[in-house]
Amino acid sequence: MSKKTDTPDYKPSIYSLTRDELIAWAIEHGEKKFRASQIWDWLYKKRVQSFDEMTNISKDFIALLNENFVVNPLKQRIVQESADGTVKYLFELPDGMLIETVLMRQYYGLSVCVTTQVGCNIGCTFCASGLIKKQRDLNNGEITAQIMLVQKYFDERGQGERVSHIVVMGIGEPFDNYTNVLKFLRTVNDDNGLAIGARHITVSTSGLAHKIREFANEGVQVNLAVSLHAPNNELRSSIMRINRSFPLEKLFAAIEYYIETTNRRVTFEYIMLNGVNDTPENAQELADLTKKIRKLSYVNLIPYNPVSEHDQYSRSPKERVEAFYDVLKKNGVNCVVRQEHGTDIDAACGQLRSNTMKRDRQKAKVGR
């Protein structure tokens, strides 16, 4: 039976250590600082998946590493490849729980969407991620491991492709797992490791205003996206429970603080739900809402991926999206209709995991 705990009882991944933590651990166990640098190089540049592959590390120290850590804690369960090059992965954690990761081919390179929690408690009424409530947070090693396994998938193909961008937009609310997400960001951004540029990394939040303020003061130069999805409190509270705790006034005060502190642009994610939030009046409300920060904000209009459990929602027709877009553009709003990826596979975030868990339960019943 899967353990439902934020402190799982299994050997940690070495990916959970920052470079400084790995150096401290090596010194504590009788090695020199350079030994940690060698291990770091094996992990993130040579991208080995076992300590035994580290040929310049002594057998005794490899035994110590094996005693205390694993390299990658994830097991690949399912891989779905789309005709457009999108790849969706279902990974199994050491405690048997399942998470999703998505690789998207963009014109600028390979972008990976990572998951930060097992399940989600935010409660957006249109989203597949919240079909299963939060079981636990992922530790930063389990988040990093997603990137490493996706990169391994492409390394084995011998095409020389490299993960160049990361979006922290998978299952879960990243700012509800703040400490682990922050360590993950610093690990993948480390110049001595994967060296993924901060401006190639985007973190998305449903709107935890106090965490947006905290994030503004961290000094990390990654991009921030806010899942907005509605232009007024009444509508947003009806489809996003988080708005009852952090209404738009509080959220936008935090966003303004973030922009003033970092001088960085904020992206607003807006899923187009037919007959719900997609009228020209809604578009005008959105334009008015973002007017004060227009120069440093951007709106992503997102086609909805239908979820069978949320059949009260459907995708806005193309003409409604175009009319909405036109109102925004007339008001000087920087906006784009997001390109779709993986429409021929379990495309909605959380859908592959949900469908697999259903099949697993059905098999278990048959086997009784």
From Swiss-Prot:
The answer to keyword rRNA processing applying to this record is yes
Q: List the disulfide bonds.
A: C113-C349
Record's Pfam families? Radical_SAM, RlmN_N
Catalytic machinery residues = E100, C349
Alphabetical GO CC annotations of the entry are: cytoplasm
Q: How is the cofactor bound?
A: Binds 1 [4Fe-4S] cluster. The cluster is coordinated with 3 cysteines and an exchangeable S-adenosyl-L-methionine.
Q: Does the keyword Mitochondrion apply?
A: no
Catalytic reactions on record:
adenosine(2503) in 23S rRNA + 2 reduced [2Fe-2S]-[ferredoxin] + 2 S-adenosyl-L-methionine = 2-methyladenosine(2503) in 23S rRNA + 5'-deoxyadenosine + L-methionine + 2 oxidized [2Fe-2S]-[ferredoxin] + S-adenosyl-L-homocysteine; adenosine(37) in tRNA + 2 reduced [2Fe-2S]-[ferredoxin] + 2 S-adenosyl-L-methionine = 2-methyladenosine(37) in tRNA + 5'-deoxyadenosine + L-methionine + 2 oxidized [2Fe-2S]-[ferredoxin] + S-adenosyl-L-homocysteine
Per the entry, which co-factors are needed? [4Fe-4S] cluster
Output the GO biological process annotations, alphabetical, semicolon-separated. Answer: rRNA base methylation; tRNA methylation
In which residues is [4Fe-4S] cluster bound?
A: C120, C124, C127
Q: Which UniProt keywords apply?
A: 4Fe-4S, Cytoplasm, Disulfide bond, Iron, Iron-sulfur, Metal-binding, Methyltransferase, rRNA processing, S-adenosyl-L-methionine, Transferase, tRNA processing
Source organism's superkingdom?
A: Bacteria
Record-annotated Radical SAM core domain positions: 106-344
What is the first-listed, main subcellular location in coarse terms?
Answer: cytoplasm
Q: NCBIfam families from the xrefs?
A: rRNA_mod_RlmN (TIGR00048)
What's in the misc comment field? Reaction proceeds by a ping-pong mechanism involving intermediate methylation of a conserved cysteine residue.
Give the record's family classification: Belongs to the radical SAM superfamily. RlmN family.
Q: What is the name of this protein?
A: Probable dual-specificity RNA methyltransferase RlmN
Please state the gene responsible for encoding this protein: rlmN
